[in-house]
């Protein structure tokens, strides 16, 4: 009897030690991720405050929309290399600078309310799907239920968007962006599962980069969905809003 109790106590200690090791890995991964996200959002805020005269940069340069592919290309590289992908500070800062500059220019062209909304929605989606990854775990039945609920919510959103009074171009942009965000959220859930259950201590940087790339792809797609139709309408000669007029007049006076 005492031997069984000793074995049970030893097992519980081993489980506690194993859980603590996983917890330290999670702390490292999410600390690196928060640093990357804070750097990108901070740099974007500096661009937005420092270059108010360039609000129409994205309106005058349609080709810049292609830079939304930067995080997608980075994601393709990380998944293609897999465990052979380097996991060091050099790789971290290469991905960080490439995606931060892209996001900064997108933010420079956006309105303040769009930026705040995109920030909040990106963080909310990240927290929600990280929680779903913990909730779903490795149980396929749970993931089937989660997928069904998400599909119903997505179809409801698309139905409301298509029945709105917006023009056909805005409806197309919203639909494409909604499907793109859903795809990136699926990848985010997968990466979160990898961090929770399969992340070794020597791969913390690589997994943090994967989470960062997923979040930046979602953030840029949200900016494109919320600001894209306005940029296109401005390029077609639509009148500027009060905020743009104020910025333009201030720049002209200076």
From Swiss-Prot:
Membrane topology field: Multi-pass membrane protein
Can you say what this protein is called? Membrane protein US20
* Membrane-spanning segments: 31-51, 62-82, 89-109, 114-134, 143-163, 178-198, 208-228
What is the gene name? Answer: US20
Q: Which residues form a coiled coil?
A: none
Superkingdom of origin organism: Viruses
The protein's UniProt keywords, in alphabetical order, are: Host membrane, Membrane, Transmembrane, Transmembrane helix
Species this chain originates from? Human cytomegalovirus (strain Merlin)
GO CC terms of this entry: host cell membrane; membrane
> Main localisation, per the record?
host cell
Q: What is its subcellular localisation?
A: Host membrane
